[in-house]
Every structure is written in structure tokens, then in C-alpha cells.
Amino acid sequence: MEPGLEHALRRTPSWSSLGGSEHQEMSFLEQENSSSWPSPAVTSSSERIRGKRRAKALRWTRQKSVEEGEPPGQGEGPRSRPAAESTGLEATFPKTTPLAQADPAGVGTPPTGWDCLPSDCTASAAGSSTDDVELATEFPATEAWECELEGLLEERPALCLSPQAPFPKLGWDDELRKPGAQIYMRFMQEHTCYDAMATSSKLVIFDTMLEIKKAFFALVANGVRAAPLWDSKKQSFVGMLTITDFILVLHRYYRSPLVQIYEIEQHKIETWREIYLQGCFKPLVSISPNDSLFEAVYTLIKNRIHRLPVLDPVSGNVLHILTHKRLLKFLHIFGSLLPRPSFLYRTIQDLGIGTFRDLAVVLETAPILTALDIFVDRRVSALPVVNECGQVVGLYSRFDVIHLAAQQTYNHLDMSVGEALRQRTLCLEGVLSCQPHESLGEVIDRIAREQVHRLVLVDETQHLLGVVSLSDILQALVLSPAGIDALGA
């Protein structure tokens, strides 16, 4: 490992600060084959100060050069960059031209050593944020926090099962054979997860001995949708606690004649995992900071998960959580510096990108419990809410469900979905739509600009035609040019 990256990786906080002195740092890759723990990495205060000053100067120099239209230099790649200390500043991105307006006369192929986003492995000062609601304040280490359960569900609507689709992929195969079709694929292959990590970020981590109720309240209080789970007995990360787990708890016990919901609240995360998984524990899906962003996209879509922990290969610490939104944001920012593929001018209808068959929807008059049933049975992340005429009037996502905990209303699941949307105290994504005649470039620009996870495809009368998700777009831009169909796998 080269000195710059090794120094950066060593700047992660020690787990002794989260769970006591017995939580020694260890190699996540060696945890199954070794009975002894590696020694914790130690860095002197003078080294930390020098690293902080160098990182600050480099970040602003790099930022200025990109804003002036110059891509980051070859010598600023992830393997040569000094460690970035936490500064309490938000991650900054260069000003870019939207993909829909980008000049097709390219800038040439991207340099392989672009240093696009600096990374900071430590927790930043209060109030800083880098990835909207997904980065949160760090909780005190007194009770240590608990983690996940299952392998987080995929961002897109239900898998297409019908043999007929309103919008077949008429010209997608031909587009992939045209020059420049693989430019985004190569761009993601040439950049590592370290490049997309935030300058300053915070992680909420739960110990598996934490009570379920406290864990879900912690998610709400910090505005995050998932948290890594640390098992102090195994001295390793064992999964992620997600909003999906909260939905499963409500769905399983709301109408149970034997168990009251308040009894489940007192269960520890460890107990809930044992009950639900019944001993079939799956390994935590993770990635290394040295792995390519192409591999990150494939791992997210292939495993139908929403969040991908980036683990330090030496200590096993969580450095960052990659998401579909983060990856598309990274690609969108620097995509305007690349030659423009011709398929960005094609319409959604022509390319057939999205889900158009067997759509999961919910009536606005249906109870919340019905929406939970659909979330569990169909494994979808959001439901278009329609009225009796079939017109889209809202969008009810899994993240809306967690606010039942914040409002102490999870014992009233007979409330209608429409009423639940009207009572939302936090303005979330809302309903953003697109139409079949819009180009793929326009759709990508809108998703990136509005920072949403999906667009609802409607006609002129607001009747539902389909859903275009982040997974659909990343599959089309990055994986399809490589001949990989992770969505259908």
C-alpha cells in the first residue's frame, strides 16, 4: 500500500472510543483466520497537524482548479493524496454543466488519476453534512449502538414479471455498439471508492446490545436511514440496521395476538436478529476503498441493497457509506467533463429504461398497514399513491414509515396513506415526474438536481406509466455497456 493511502486509512477513529478499551482495532479481512488482533494504528499529534494543513491547502487548490475548468491533476489520485483531517466543512463540488446541456465535443478520455472528492475518515464537527440526510451526528459511546438485519432492499420498484412491456428497449442494443457508449463505464472503472468518499462525514454506529426502540429513535434523530451494526462479542461488524427492519417489526407484530408491540420495543437488536434471521446470518456486504466505483455500482444493484459500507482493509473500520445517490452525484458532476454519449439524447420511451410492468401502487384511501404489506411482499422502496381515477397524487416511501416512530403513531396503522402524507412533519422527496418523450439526459439532470431516488413516469393526465429509479439509471450508464444485467440477475 502506498504511503498516502496508508496514512489516510490509519486516520479512522479507534473502536475503543465506541465500545470501551476491549474493542481493539482489527483487520476485517483477517477476522476469521486469526485469533489475535493487529495493534491499533498510532499517529503523533505533529503528524496530524501537518496532515490537516496539507489536506486543507490541497482541497481548496483542487477545488479552484476544477471550478476554472481544469480537471484534477494526475498526481492527485487517491493513492498519492495525503490524509484529510476533519475540518467541519461540508463536502464541496465543482460547478458543472448539466448533462442535458453538455457539449458533445469532448474533453477527451478522463485521466486515470483524478482526485475528485477528498476523503475524511473521522467524524466532523457538529452541523456539517455531506450527503444530505444520510450523514448524521455521532452518538455517545456509552451504550454503543446496534446495527442491521438483512441485506437492505433495492431502490427500484418491483421486478418486471409480465411478458409485455409498454416501452420495449427498441434501440438500446444498437446504442451500446456506438462509439463513446462505454465512456461512463470506463470512468467508473478508473476511479476508486476513495474518490467518491466525502471530505467530512459522520457515521452513526449501533452496538447489537442496544434496544430496538432506542435504535430506531436514533435513526430519526439523526436523519439517517441505516447504521452499521457492531457486535462486541465477535469484535466485528455484522450487518446494517435499516428502515426495512422497522417495517418488518411493525408488519410482524402489529396484529399479533400473542405479542404486544411495546414488548418488542424492549428487545435488543441482537435478539431481533436472532428471531428474524433464525440463525441464517448472511455476511455483511462491504467494499474496500481501493475497489473501483464500477464494482460498487455492481455490488449495490446485484445484492439489491441501498447502502454499501466502505471498510478499511487494515483495521476493519467503517470509513463511509456509499449509496446509489452518492455514486450518481459523483458521475453527474464530472460527467460534464467527458464526451457526451449519443444515448443521452434518446428518449426514455425509446430506450425502455425504468420499470413499466407489474408496478406496485397503493390507493390514497388504503391504510398504512396495506402499504407495509406491499413493502414486505414486493420488496420495493417506494409506492406511487394514486386516487380512484388512477392519477398519481403522492409517493409513500419506506423512509416515511420511520416517521411513525418520531411521531409515536406506529400503533395507529389503520390511518390512511393519504392522511399520513398530509401529517408529515418533514418535507421529503415529494412526487417528481417525467414523461416518455423526455431524454435520458434530462431525466438524469432532474434526479441529480432534486436529489431524489426516483422519478414517476406519467402521461399528460398524470396517470401512472412507470418508475425510473437510480438503479435503472446506473445500470444503463455503467453496467449495460459492459454487458452486465445486474437488475435481472
From Swiss-Prot:
Keywords assigned by UniProt, alphabetized: ATP-binding, CBS domain, Fatty acid biosynthesis, Fatty acid metabolism, Glycoprotein, Lipid biosynthesis, Lipid metabolism, Nucleotide-binding, Phosphoprotein, Repeat
Binding positions for AMP 1 per the UniProt entry: 240-245, 285, 306-307
Domain called CBS: residue spans: 197-258, 280-340, 355-415, 427-486
Residue numbers covered by motif AMPK pseudosubstrate: 293-314
Biased composition (Basic residues): 50-62
Residues involved in ATP 1 binding: 225, 240-245, 285, 306-307
Binding locations of AMP 3: 306, 355, 360, 381-382, 453, 469-472
GO terms for cellular component: cytoplasm; cytosol; extracellular space; nucleoplasm; nucleotide-activated protein kinase complex; nucleus
Record: residues binding ADP 2: 225, 325, 397-400, 424, 432, 453-454
Annotated tissue distribution: Skeletal muscle, with weak expression in heart and pancreas.
Entry-linked Gene3D superfamilies: CBS-domain (3.10.580.10)
Sequence ranges of Low complexity compositional bias: 34-46
Record function comment: AMP/ATP-binding subunit of AMP-activated protein kinase (AMPK), an energy sensor protein kinase that plays a key role in regulating cellular energy metabolism. In response to reduction of intracellular ATP levels, AMPK activates energy-producing pathways and inhibits energy-consuming processes: inhibits protein, carbohydrate and lipid biosynthesis, as well as cell growth and proliferation. AMPK acts via direct phosphorylation of metabolic enzymes, and by longer-term effects via phosphorylation of transcription regulators.
Subunit-structure text: AMPK is a heterotrimer of an alpha catalytic subunit (PRKAA1 or PRKAA2), a beta (PRKAB1 or PRKAB2) and a gamma non-catalytic subunits (PRKAG1, PRKAG2 or PRKAG3). Interacts with FNIP1 and FNIP2.
Family to which this protein belongs: Belongs to the 5'-AMP-activated protein kinase gamma subunit family.
Name of the featured protein: 5'-AMP-activated protein kinase subunit gamma-3
Organism name: Homo sapiens (Human)
Lineage, opening ranks: Eukaryota, Metazoa, Chordata, Craniata, Vertebrata
